[in-house]
């Protein structure tokens, strides 16, 4: 199907075509496609999400109604959270009997997932900026009793200044006080244990906003390690790992990170929802507080002299440490190249350029798992899986 052939006919979507000129495809979902578009009066660029509520004619009347209601619910939630600096802004909407057109700000930097693919792993500094913004978004959503239910790097966009914008509220839901959910939805490797338990136990009480915090932990781990905390080629075994909270800080990347960042990740990946960190608790964690600089500093000659002495002492130690560094021999490189950080990054970068995909570096570290998520969040029934 050509690019133009995939577009809805202009006779049925006169309002959209009157104001916007659709361009190339930016992404696809199960029943939707995202295109760049130009606003004709201003010549500004936007992104339009075109949702075919009929599934190309393959959906039943009941499925069409469900998708229509889900889209209207997504639009309603987007309007409720409009104005937040880190949430994608819905600019315009158009509706016909068969299509919805949702016009958003265009994020030219693309997905956080693509940025991570390019960078392999992120530093603590980059991760701190991204996670603080994400947690502030989640905090705002949860105060409105809105649960996102599909948090993952693919649904986090970046603007030109590398600020994040949370998107894809298709599975979002605004809860009534005390309400619990039982639907199994989301992307398998980001599912919280209680969501999986709901599919296996008819008597399970359900789940709430805590599922977003679990997904946040998976995202943070993935940004730092470059691979997800829970992965197995057999999906059922991966789900068992999630339900038992079976993950490790065993890959070489974790040797470069502080205990503080590991502690925060472990506060998210707690199997019991009631013991899991909330967004507010996470923002108060030392990981986000240790680099906060006071606006006013009182001058202290004694303190300044102490800093100078410590700086000189540190410089001397670094110099002698540098002098004692052992040369990298051929035997060391052959025996364990991943133990050397510069070589590790070089190998990762060239492996991707040569093979076009990431290579497995160990049983507990598989970047290929990152690419197993479908473009749109997955709906599935665990009851149909065989052990």
Curated annotation (Swiss-Prot):
<keyword id="KW-0119">Carbohydrate metabolism</keyword>
<feature type="active site" description="Proton acceptor">
    <location>
        <position position="150"/>
    </location>
</feature>
<comment type="function">
    <text>Catalytic subunit of the phosphorylase b kinase (PHK), which mediates the neural and hormonal regulation of glycogen breakdown (glycogenolysis) by phosphorylating and thereby activating glycogen phosphorylase. In vitro, phosphorylates PYGM, TNNI3, MAPT/TAU, GAP43 and NRGN/RC3.</text>
</comment>
<dbReference type="GO" id="GO:0005524">
    <property type="term" value="F:ATP binding"/>
</dbReference>
<dbReference type="GO" id="GO:0005516">
    <property type="term" value="F:calmodulin binding"/>
</dbReference>
<comment type="subunit">
    <text>Hexadecamer of 4 heterotetramers, each composed of alpha, beta, gamma, and delta subunits. Alpha (PHKA1 or PHKA2) and beta (PHKB) are regulatory subunits, gamma (PHKG1 or PHKG2) is the catalytic subunit, and delta is calmodulin.</text>
</comment>
<dbReference type="InterPro" id="IPR017441">
    <property type="entry name" value="Protein_kinase_ATP_BS"/>
</dbReference>
<keyword id="KW-0547">Nucleotide-binding</keyword>
<keyword id="KW-0321">Glycogen metabolism</keyword>
<keyword id="KW-0723">Serine/threonine-protein kinase</keyword>
<dbReference type="GO" id="GO:0106310">
    <property type="term" value="F:protein serine kinase activity"/>
</dbReference>
<dbReference type="GO" id="GO:0098723">
    <property type="term" value="C:skeletal muscle myofibril"/>
</dbReference>
<feature type="domain" description="Protein kinase">
    <location>
        <begin position="20"/>
        <end position="288"/>
    </location>
</feature>
<dbReference type="InterPro" id="IPR011009">
    <property type="entry name" value="Kinase-like_dom_sf"/>
</dbReference>
<dbReference type="GO" id="GO:0005977">
    <property type="term" value="P:glycogen metabolic process"/>
</dbReference>
<comment type="similarity">
    <text>Belongs to the protein kinase superfamily. CAMK Ser/Thr protein kinase family.</text>
</comment>
<dbReference type="Pfam" id="PF00069">
    <property type="entry name" value="Pkinase"/>
</dbReference>
<dbReference type="GO" id="GO:0005964">
    <property type="term" value="C:phosphorylase kinase complex"/>
</dbReference>
<keyword id="KW-0808">Transferase</keyword>
<keyword id="KW-0112">Calmodulin-binding</keyword>
<protein>
    <recommendedName>
        <fullName>Phosphorylase b kinase gamma catalytic chain, skeletal muscle/heart isoform</fullName>
        <ecNumber>2.7.11.19</ecNumber>
        <ecNumber>2.7.11.1</ecNumber>
        <ecNumber>2.7.11.26</ecNumber>
    </recommendedName>
</protein>
<dbReference type="InterPro" id="IPR000719">
    <property type="entry name" value="Prot_kinase_dom"/>
</dbReference>
<feature type="region of interest" description="Calmodulin-binding (domain-N)">
    <location>
        <begin position="303"/>
        <end position="327"/>
    </location>
</feature>
<keyword id="KW-0067">ATP-binding</keyword>
<keyword id="KW-0418">Kinase</keyword>
<feature type="binding site">
    <location>
        <position position="49"/>
    </location>
    <ligand>
        <name>ATP</name>
    </ligand>
</feature>
<feature type="binding site">
    <location>
        <begin position="26"/>
        <end position="34"/>
    </location>
    <ligand>
        <name>ATP</name>
    </ligand>
</feature>
<dbReference type="GO" id="GO:0004689">
    <property type="term" value="F:phosphorylase kinase activity"/>
</dbReference>
<feature type="region of interest" description="Calmodulin-binding (domain-C)">
    <location>
        <begin position="343"/>
        <end position="367"/>
    </location>
</feature>
<dbReference type="InterPro" id="IPR008271">
    <property type="entry name" value="Ser/Thr_kinase_AS"/>
</dbReference>
<dbReference type="InterPro" id="IPR002291">
    <property type="entry name" value="Phosph_kin_gamma"/>
</dbReference>
<keyword id="KW-0514">Muscle protein</keyword>
């Amino acid at each position: 199907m050509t690019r133009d052939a995939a577009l809805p006919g202009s006779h049925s979507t006169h309002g959209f075509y009157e104001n916007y000129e659709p361009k190339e495809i930016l992404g696809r979902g199960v029943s939707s496609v995202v295109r760049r578009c130009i606003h004709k009066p201003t010549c500004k660029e936007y992104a339009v999400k075109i949702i075919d509520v009929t599934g190309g004619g393959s959906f039943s009347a009941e499925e069409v109604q469900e998708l229509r209601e889900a889209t209207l619910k997504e639009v309603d939630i987007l309007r409720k959270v409009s104005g937040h600096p880190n949430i994608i802004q819905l600019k315009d909407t158009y509706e016909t009997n068969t299509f919805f057109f949702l016009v958003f700000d265009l994020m030219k930097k693309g997905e956080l997932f693509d940025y991570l693919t390019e960078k392999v792993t992120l530093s603590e500094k980059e991760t701190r900026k991204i996670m603080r913004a994400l947690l502030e978004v989640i905090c705002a959503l949860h105060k409105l009793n809105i649960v996102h239910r599909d948090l993952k790097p693919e649904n986090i966009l970046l603007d030109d200044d590398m600020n994040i914008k949370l998107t894809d509220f298709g599975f979002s839901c605004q809860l009534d006080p005390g309400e619990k959910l039982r639907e199994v939805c989301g992307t398998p490797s980001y599912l919280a244990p209680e969501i999986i338990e709901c599919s296996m136990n008819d008597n399970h009480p359900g789940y709430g906003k805590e599922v977003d915090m679990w997904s946040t932990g998976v995202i943070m781990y993935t940004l730092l390690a470059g691979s997800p905390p829970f992965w197995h080629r057999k999906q059922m075994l991966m789900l068992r790992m999630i339900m038992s909270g079976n993950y490790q800080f065993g890959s070489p990347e974790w040797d470069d990170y502080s205990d503080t960042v590991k502690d925060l990740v472990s506060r998210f990946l707690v199997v019991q929802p009631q013991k899991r960190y909330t967004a507010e608790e996470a923002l108060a964690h030392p990981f986000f507080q240790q680099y906060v600089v006071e606006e006013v500093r009182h001058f202290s000659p004694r303190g300044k002299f102490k800093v100078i002495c410590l700086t000189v002492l540190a410089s001397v130690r670094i110099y002698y440490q540098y002098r004692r560094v052992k040369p990298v021999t051929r035997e060391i490189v052959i025996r364990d190249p991943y133990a050397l950080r510069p070589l590790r990054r070089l190998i990762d970068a060239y492996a991707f350029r040569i093979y076009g995909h990431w290579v497995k570096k160990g049983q507990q570290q598989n970047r290929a798992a990152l690419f197993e998520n479908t473009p749109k969040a997955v709906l599935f029934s665990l009851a149909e899986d065989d052990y």
